[in-house]
């Protein structure tokens, strides 16, 4: 081993981990205060640089906010103290590895401005020995990993205000699309709540209204038969539509619609007259008028709901 005089060029890098020569305590009379002889008398001084005034001590951040305190204290938008403390914890973990390989822990100080102490190496090694579910960071960082990638159980039990606002977006979109699909299947346009939630409901209602206006008074088409046998296709043409059951001919529907246009409720004499003229039973005419009244009521309700949800129209 070389003499101390030949170790002069390395004296400036004496406290860096890359230095291969280590100086014991008794070699210098003016030894710095951060290299004491006994581990129990190490001072707990955290001297950070002046550009990080808001950083908390490493030990407090480690055992108070990462390990013991619940996750509700962590807000997604805070000051940058958590970022700095996380970096220092990573440096602390990196500095601890050479000391476990046989390097004395007293000389592993970086500089007089940024000093990293290891007051409790056993507790710290246990804290970082368990790797989290992402395979790189410790288990303490699992809460941030789950928040970033949206685990279902984390989204269900999250207390972050940002996550609550963020999860309203996909849920509202899913509810809007589900309401639109259900409306297309049952023949009704989307409700006013889905109109307010997204543009899908407005498009569905607009398509329904255009289709209704395209049929001239729903008079001469077989699609305008009894309401309980009707299955509308809606605005989406990609869905498979069931073949409509229509027990009435076009001539019968035209005459029934003409009578319904003059009087919504039909009396018994007129009903018997229609049944004889159209070769239908009295019960068939009666049921057709009942279904046609329900259909008209539903059309008026949907039209009122559509225009009340869109005040500009």
UniProtKB/Swiss-Prot annotation:
Q: Give the protein family.
A: Belongs to the Abd-B homeobox family.
Q: Where is this chain primarily localised? A: nucleus
- The entry's DNA-binding region feature spans 241-300
**Disordered as annotated region, ranges:** 188-246
State where composition is biased (Basic and acidic residues): 207-217
> Entry's Pfam families?
DUF3528 (PF12045), Homeodomain (PF00046)
Under PROSITE patterns, the record lists: HOMEOBOX_1, HOMEOBOX_2
| Function of the protein | Sequence-specific transcription factor which is part of a developmental regulatory system that provides cells with specific positional identities on the anterior-posterior axis.
Keywords, A to Z, come to: Developmental protein, DNA-binding, Homeobox, Nucleus, Transcription, Transcription regulation
Q: Look up the record and give one Gene Ontology term from the biological process aspect.
A: embryonic forelimb morphogenesis
Name of the molecule in the record: Homeobox protein Hox-A11
List the subcellular locations: Nucleus
Q: Does the keyword Magnesium apply?
A: no
Is the DNA-binding keyword given for this protein? yes
- Report the GO molecular function annotations: DNA binding; DNA-binding transcription factor activity, RNA polymerase II-specific; sequence-specific double-stranded DNA binding
> What are the record's GO terms for cellular component?
nucleoplasm; protein-containing complex; protein-DNA complex; transcription regulator complex
What CDD domains does the record point to?
A: homeodomain (cd00086)
Between which residues do disulfide bridges form? none
């Amino acid at each position: 081993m070389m003499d101390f005089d030949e170790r002069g060029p390395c004296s400036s890098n004496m406290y860096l981990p890359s230095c291969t020569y280590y100086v014991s305590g008794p070699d210098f009379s003016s030894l710095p205060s951060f290299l004491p002889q006994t581990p129990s008398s190490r001072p707990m001084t955290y001297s950070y640089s002046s550009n990080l005034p808001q950083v908390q001590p490493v030990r407090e951040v480690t055992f108070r906010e990462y390990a013991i305190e619940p996750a509700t204290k962590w807000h997604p938008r805070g000051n940058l103290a958590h970022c700095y403390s996380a970096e220092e914890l990573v440096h602390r973990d990196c500095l601890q590895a050479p000391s476990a390989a046989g390097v004395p822990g007293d000389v592993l100080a970086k500089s007089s401005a940024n000093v990293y102490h290891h007051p409790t190496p056993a507790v710290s090694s246990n804290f970082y020995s368990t790797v989290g579910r992402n395979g790189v960071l410790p288990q303490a960082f699992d809460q941030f990993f789950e928040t970033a990638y949206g685990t279902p159980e984390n989204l269900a039990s999250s207390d972050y205000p940002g996550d609550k606002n963020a999860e309203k977006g996909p849920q509202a979109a899913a509810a809007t699309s589900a309401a639109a699909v259900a409306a297309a299947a049952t023949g009704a346009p989307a409700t006013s709540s889905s109109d307010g939630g997204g543009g899908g409901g407005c498009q569905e209602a607009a398509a329904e209204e255009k289709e209704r206006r395209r049929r001239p008074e729903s008079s001469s088409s077989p699609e305008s038969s009894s309401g309980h046998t009707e299955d509308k296709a809606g605005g989406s043409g990609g869905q498979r539509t069931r073949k409509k059951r229509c027990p009435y001919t076009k001539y019968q529907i035209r005459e029934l619609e003409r009578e319904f246009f003059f009087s919504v409720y039909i009396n018994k004499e007129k009903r018997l007259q229609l049944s004889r003229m159209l070769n239908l039973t009295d019960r068939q005419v009666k049921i057709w008028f009942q279904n046609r009244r329900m259909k008209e009521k539903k059309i008026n309700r949907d039209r009122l709901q559509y225009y009340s949800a869109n005040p500009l129209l």
